C-alpha cells in the first residue's frame, strides 16, 4: 500500500528516508555523497513522484521504491 509521504511529519519522513539510505548502501560511483545529500536526493524523488513510500502488510515494514516497480 502506498503511503502519502505528504501526510507524514517532516521529522518522521526524514527518519524514514535516512533509514532507507543507510540500509541500501548504494554505490554512488567515484565521488561519495554525504548522508544529507542522499536523503535530499530521495526526498526529491518522492516529491517528483518517481519514488513512493510503501507499507508492506506482510512484513509490517515501510520501504521506498521506484514507482514503476510498485505493484499492489
From Swiss-Prot:
Disulfide linkage: none
Source domain of life: Bacteria
InterPro entries: UPF0270, YehU-like_sf
Similarity remark: Belongs to the UPF0270 family.
Protein name as it appears in the record: UPF0270 protein YheU
Organism (species): Salmonella dublin (strain CT_02021853)
Amino acid at each position: 500500500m502506498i503511503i502519502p509521504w505528504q501526510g507524514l511529519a517532516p521529522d518522521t519522513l526524514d527518519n524514514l528516508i535516512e533509514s532507507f539510505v543507510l540500509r541500501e548502501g548504494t554505490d554512488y560511483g567515484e565521488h561519495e555523497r554525504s548522508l544529507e545529500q542522499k536523503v535530499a536526493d530521495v526526498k526529491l524523488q518522492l516529491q517528483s513522484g518517481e519514488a513512493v513510500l510503501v507499507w508492506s502488510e506482510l512484513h509490517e515494514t515501510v520501504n521506498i521504491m521506484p514507482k514503476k516497480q510498485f505493484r499492489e
